[in-house]
Amino acid sequence: MSESVTNWIKGLSGQDEVVSMQGSATLALELAAHSFVAGKVLLVSTGYYSDRLEKLLPNDCELTICEYEELDSIKGNFDWVLCAYTETSVAFKVDLESVKNKANECKAKLFVDATGSIGLEDNHQLADVMAFSSCKGLFGLTGAGFVAYKSDLNPKDLDTFYFNLNTHKNKMTTGPYHAIASLYGVIEKHNIFKQRVVNSKNTILEKYQDIVRESNQPLLCTYLEGEVAPNDDSIVLYSPRSELSGSVICHFGE
């Protein structure tokens, strides 16, 4: 079961190695950052979740932060470029090919927060390192974090036990078995679940075409320039972590 899920995630992520652990995407992102990221770092800012990556980095990184719209103006070399593929706090998707091209131009590796994009968006293979969780676009139970990376990279051997990628890679502690089991049940149905998200997304874009962003639309969620109010007590609205004049809706459970 675990091998089947791991191989499936390798295919979705376009990565050679996938390490699972109990915990959230936040844990996976911080562990990935401490296992691989060092030196000069360029952080591409798009909202709350991209900006939060600064707090997850090793303290000795030399950090430069740029707005996504200013990416073309960045010059010089870096060791790493960091971004959130789908910034759920504002329902914005970066053009990952453009970010990868800038990373190549800067002679840098690419680190991607794929929490809101894995299982839904394409081109994850462009990342050198990425991290995400078992829910959202993988449609599994919450509770598993994943770090995925290319085989030509070697994680640092940190002087900690639990907070150490090699500990989880070598299965030296209890794994996220419940979440892995849920993902095993998703594999054959993932395309069905994804299509429901696509259908919901297209419906919203068509219905509210005058108040949605023209580009950079993620499948996971949509920003509407207006206030959304529930018409049923059973509806749970998404509360974004960014201060917005409009509303963000997510396309699950349709």
Regions of interest found by a model, annotated:
Residues L27, H34-D79:
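PLP-dependent aminotransferase-like
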